[in-house]
Design a protein with these regions (language model features):
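Nucleic-acid nuclease catalytic cores
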Residues: 118-149
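Acidic-basic catalytic patches of nuclease active cores, encompassing PD-(D/E)XK
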Residues: 10-70
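Short, electropositive alpha-helical surface patch
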Residues: 141-164
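Mg2+/Mn2+-dependent nuclease catalytic core
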Residues: 96-123
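Conserved catalytic cores of phosphodiester-cleaving nucleases, focusing on short active-site segments
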Residues: 80-101
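Charged phosphate-binding loop/patch that engages nucleotide di/tri-phosphates or the phosphate backbone
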Residues: 2-11, 15-19, 165-194
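Short, solvent-exposed loop/turn segments at secondary-structure junctions
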Residues: 56-57, 100-103, 137-138
Length: 194
């Protein structure tokens, strides 16, 4: 709000909105962290969020008990979001969230993540992606082998993976009344196929 000194009235400044991308996927991540805690506490599975490797460069110490990181850099590209053990099998997966209603953009899946998925599949791991289509409030689990083959076959002529493909080759994941994204029954079916 701008007010002139001689009382000529008030002029409202237009409010500008800032678009931020830092919290994309935070709802799904929070839900999965909650779900994984639920699984761990009930001795169902041990799945953890992988920390992002950073190199701290500058720290401000306003008080001894309140250090604030002022500058940090990613050490190297991270792999996937989650890993752990279930029924004696190594589990590794990525969580992806989009507002799109019909597809998931390739740009949100990084080459180093795809390479990591291939390496884990080669070693016999259970590897998948959990997609959350927030506009539709729908969750799907897609085995990484389907994601990898779709991207390899379509990278030149498509920019996204259609929701119809995810529905065809993946499985829906229910959100329970307790806010648990219950993906373990789908993982059971993946393990049983081995």
């Amino acid at each position: 709000m701008i007010q002139y000194p001689k009382g000529h009235g008030k002029i409202s400044s237009p409010q500008t909105s800032t678009v931020t991308y830092g919290s994309r996927g935070m709802f799904l991540e929070t839900l999965l962290n909650q779900t994984n805690d639920y699984y761990r506490l009930r001795k169902i599975a041990v799945i953890h969020k992988k920390p992002t490797p950073i190199q701290v460069v500058k720290v401000d110490y306003p008080k001894r008990s309140a250090a604030v990181i002022k500058e940090a850099y990613y050490r190297h590209a991270s792999t996937t979001d989650y890993n752990g053990v279930y029924r004696g099998c190594y589990i590794d997966f990525e969580a992806k969230e989009t507002k799109n209603k019909t597809s998931f953009p390739f740009i949100n899946i990084h080459e180093h993540q795809l390479q990591h998925m291939e390496e884990c599949i080669f070693q016999g791991g259970i590897v998948f992606v959990i997609f959350y289509f927030s506009s539709l409030n729908e969750y799907y689990l897609l085995e990484s082998q389907y994601l990898l083959s779709f991207i390899k076959e379509n990278k030149e002529n498509k920019k996204s993976i259609p929701l119809d493909y995810i529905k065809k080759y993946g499985e829906p994941i229910p959100l329970t009344v307790q806010s648990i994204l219950d993906y373990i029954p789908v993982v059971d079916r993946l393990i049983d196929k081995i």
